[in-house]
Amino acid sequence: IYKTDTFFYPSQASESSRRAFGEAWPARAREIVTASVDLYLQEHWGSALDAMRCDTHDAAPVSKNLTEKQRQAVKDKFTAVNLAFDLCEKGGQKTWRAPFLETAETLRSAVRDNVCVAYTQFYLRYKDSGFTKKHPEKYIKRSPEEVSLVVEGLFGGRS
């Protein structure tokens, strides 16, 4: 967050910053911001994103005729995703603040575009698959709407 915040405004490139740092500075600062956002996503959401990745060739809902091994794989995916959201909510990310509104919105947008989209597809693909015969609430803890609410509250967003 610090790196993203530090380089966001210089990337807007006023004439004085171009004179001071050279013509290539604004592009370099934007690269640093992008790399910092990507690093944040990988560090804090990477395992959840990996678990949510579906076969891109077939995003259709899964049939209800899953084998025991397939059911366990889906349970493991939901467990990994839930852990990432639990860490976000209870591990402090909800209280992190970005001093500049633009930085906060850049980070929220990255989470929205990556995590929320992936979760919605993941949820729709598996929610009715019958992967758990008892206690689906143990695995399906959040709806896509609830995930979006969590994301909108990150980095000083709405409470």
Report residues per predicted region:
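Extended alpha-helical "rod" scaffolds
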Residues: 1-159
